[in-house]
Every structure is written in C-alpha cells, then in structure tokens.
C-alpha cells in the first residue's frame, strides 16, 4: 500500500501498521487495541465510532441504548434523564486532523453533535492542528504546533487524502453524470454523497 496524504509532508510506504478505512470496514484487516485515525471528516468519525463499539449481533437493544444515553425508562426523574452509562470502549482511539479548527466542525448540523458526543463518551482523544512526521515501531510521530509527540499505536487508519479517480469514467466513453464522492472526494458527507 502506498498512500500520500494530500497536503501533508508524509508519505507512508508499506508499513504493516497502516490500514485503509475500506479494508477496516469490510473486515479485511485485523485492527489492534490502540489505534490512530488520520482524518476527522465524516469518514474518520464513522470509522472511529465503528472501532470503539464492541461487535454485536444485530442492533443494539433499546434498554442498552437508553442506559448509554441516560434516558430514564421508568420516567421517575424530572426530564426523564439519569446519569449516562456508556459501555467501555472496545479500543483506545486517537482521532487526528491537520486543520486547527475543532474536530467535527463541518459534520452535519443536525447530527454532528451526536457523533462528537458518542466519541467523547467512548474516550476518543481528539487532536487538531497535527502534522504527521513518521510511523515506526514506536508508533505514529506527530507534532501539535511545536510539541512533538509519539502515539503508541498498533495501527494507523487512513481516512484522509482521498482523491477522485476518473479513469474508468473517461475510458468508458459513455455519458454519465459524476456526483457525490465520484465527482469530488474531499469533505464527503451524506448530503453530498
């Protein structure tokens, strides 16, 4: 695998620690207990949430969801809320972005808060203004401003730097309309997808 992070000085070549989010979501990659997710757009948030959850068969049972979000099923408390009791996260996750803006700032107006709250409840560390130095046996070497840091991680999952590939579109010669991520892969969200 060779990935180049668009706009970054780092190029990752054949590191066994580096995984594609596509392989992770398809179940084609073994993911360790400590993970760095590069890219805090919609895909990065979704992948982080996916990795923080414990595998289960089917949907989360409603009583479990109510407990996680602090909803009083009996209705005995004012406002129907009790202290939330989220489950322990399945992994230790650090979500990183190069931008200096708050993580998740550009997520959907009606759902972004849920994604941020979910990752917060799963103890996901969210780091902004990062530059990526290198990956080695010690982990992912980053800088936050002038501070150097090494994240001790088993895997680095890339959710950044996607570029639209239009070769098949051009080769086919048929009249298609390019939309969503096929047209412009950057900052993809459900509305534009």
Where are these regions (language model features)?
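Single conserved hydrophobic/aromatic residue that forms the stacking wall/gate
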Residues: 1-7, 12
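N-terminal Rossmann-like dinucleotide/flavin-binding domain of flavoprotein oxidoreductases
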Residues: 104-130
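Residues within well-ordered alpha-helices
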Residues: 1, 115, 165-168
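Residue-level signal for WD-repeat beta-propeller blades
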Residues: 4-5, 87, 134
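A conserved short coil-to-beta-strand element within the FAD-binding core of flavoproteins
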Residues: 128-139
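Rossmann-like dinucleotide/flavin-binding elements
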Residues: 15-107, 142-193
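Short aromatic/basic micro-patch
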Residues: 4-5, 126, 150-152
């Amino acid at each position: 695998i060779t990935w180049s992070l668009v706009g970054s000085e780092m190029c990752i070549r054949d590191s066994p620690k580096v995984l594609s989010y596509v392989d992770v979501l398809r179940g084609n990659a073994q993911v360790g207990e400590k993970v760095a997710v590069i890219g805090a757009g919609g895909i990065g948030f979704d992948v982080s949430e996916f990795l923080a959850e414990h595998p289960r068969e089917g949907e989360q049972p409603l009583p479990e969801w109510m407990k996680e979000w602090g909803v009083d099923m009996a209705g005995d408390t004012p406002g129907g809320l009790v202290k939330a009791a989220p489950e322990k996260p399945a992994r230790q996750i650090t979500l990183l972005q190069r931008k200096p803006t708050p993580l998740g700032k550009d997520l959907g107006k009606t759902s972004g808060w849920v994604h941020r709250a979910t990752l917060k409840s799963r103890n996901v560390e969210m780091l902004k203004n990062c530059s990526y130095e290198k990956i080695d046996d010690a982990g992912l070497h980053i800088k936050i401003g002038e501070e150097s840091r090494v994240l001790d991680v088993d895997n680095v999952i890339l959710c950044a730097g996607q570029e639209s590939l239009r070769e098949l579109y051009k080769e086919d010669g048929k009249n298609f309309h390019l939309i969503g991520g096929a047209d412009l892969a950057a900052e993809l969200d459900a509305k534009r997808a």
